[in-house]
Each structure stands twice: as C-alpha cells, then as structure tokens.
Amino acid sequence: MNAAVGLGLLFLLAGYFVPQTCERKGPRRFLRERWTRIGVPLVVFAFAANLPIALAVEQPASFGGFVGSLYDDAWRPLYLHLWFLGHLMLYSAAYVTWRRFSGRAPHSWPTPGHRSILAFTLGLVGVTWVIRWWYSVDEWVPLLWVVPAEPARLPQYVSLFVLGAMAYRGDWLRTMPSGVGRTWLGVGLAASLCMVAVQMLAPDSSRYNQLANGGLGWPSVVRSGLEGLVCAGLAVGVLVVVQDLVHRPLRLVSAMAATSYAAYILHVYIVVPIQASIAEPDVSPFLKFSVVAVLAVLLSFGAAHLSGRVPGIRRLLGTGPPRVPEATSS
C-alpha cells in the first residue's frame, strides 16, 4: 500500500512546490539550496551512518569487493531509505534543465475531471505493466549509475512529480471539485480493499504479495491495475478531501509538519532497533505492529524535535528556527 500511493504522494507534493520555489529564487539559488537541504544530509548520513552499518553487516574480505557488491545492489545499502532524496535531487535538476532549454512560457493546465484522471490511470497501468515485462517488483538498478531506482514503480514516481508541477501551474488543489475528489477517494479505497481481500482470502499462490511481480500474464495486469487505481484514487481523493475538511492547521499537526523531514531521515535508525527488540516474543503480529508504529512515530518526531537544540544537527536537518530577514535601514 505504501509503495502504491505513499511515496507517490510525497513525489506529487514535492513536484507541486518545485515551480514556485524555483521561480522565486532563480534556478542557481534553487539548486544550491536544494543541495544544502537534500544533498548534504544524504551524503552525510550515507557515509557517516549507512556505510558503517553496511560494513558491520557484510564484513567484507576486501574493500574493492565490498564496493562492487554495493553497485550490484544498486547502492541500496549506502542509501537505505534516503534513495528518495536522491530522486528528488535528480527530478529537481531535470525540472530546471527543462525550463532552461524549453524556451516556452509556463503553461497553466486546466483542472482535470473524471475522464482525464481515468486516462492517466489507464496510461500509468499500461506503462507499469509493460516495464514489468523486463523489471519485476523489488528489482533495483543504479539510475545514472549513482542512485537506486526500482523501474517497476518508476513510472508512478516520475509521473506524479510531473503532475505535482502541473497542479501548481493550474491551481488544481484549490479548483478541483469536491465531488471529483470524493469519487476517486472511493475508487482508491475500493482498490485498497481488493488488495487486502486478495492477500487475506486468496490461496497462498495467489496472494497479493505473491501475485506476479512482473511478466506478461494476467496476474501482473491485476497487480499493476490495482496499484494504479490505488495511486490515482487516493492521490486525488486524499488531497481534495483533507483540504475540504481541514480549514486551519492544528497546532500538533503544524509542529509535526515542521519536523517531518528530519523525522523521515531519522526514522529508520529508530524503527529497526524497535522491531528487532520485539521480534522474539510470541504475541500477535497486529500487537507488534501497533507497538512499533506508536513508538516509532513518537520517538522519530521526538528525536526530530530535539535535533533543533543541537547546533550542527539542526542545521543539517533543517530543524532550527526560521531565519528572519534583517530589516534594511532607510
């Protein structure tokens, strides 16, 4: 479920904010600040945290062989969850490059209706299915030789980033009719229930996580189709419905939003030890999941909040107080 919509939503929102930020700051300053905000934390955590962890786990006989094994695994042990930041850097650079060489004024895209959303969904399903003829789910490659990428899900991530930029140009989040959002929220929830039903009720060989990870057959079509419906349905529905319901931010939500980036970077280093500590007790998996989820959220956001009190870390994670521009004397 997370792969079907969670990360896609993050790329959609990231794409939404790129055009306005780039235009306000200019391409050079935009890329420079994006490197400071995204690239520097990625490099620091990759080499200061993830690399020692990978070395401790692998215990390689030679460093050269270790580097080769990292490349064969698409650098994933070096990036871990931070591959998302690598993609944001690439997509941001691609946007700036496109704006630089397209030579066209920004275009305002009309708000999509049911037909446009359905056409996008069918196109996403088709492209995803075709790519999975060659690349199965959870098969990773080093994109441009340096960034881990999962081709089976790349169409979703790239297309939603592009749609986010288009949504900003057309002011879709404000002009999207509530009825369209509610309808597609229903579509996304229905497809999600189908995923759960296939996983829980189908025979072992046909459960969702064992349903063809790729190939030409109908199981791959079913999986690609369900993921496409969940992605489009919830991406449209959640954003529109939440905007209708929440007219002013709650203090807790605002505080969490301010530290969400830091919490994302830190959460893996918190979640994995918690999972390992409760792996042995013979208790309900649902209870284990609930305990890990609650503790992970509390500790991740707590650590992100506390990072704002450590000078070097708060600069790295962006959790320091916002800078107030100096007033110019007349």
Regions found by a protein language model. Name each.
Residues 1-330:
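Alpha-helical transmembrane segments and their immediate juxtamembrane cytosolic regions
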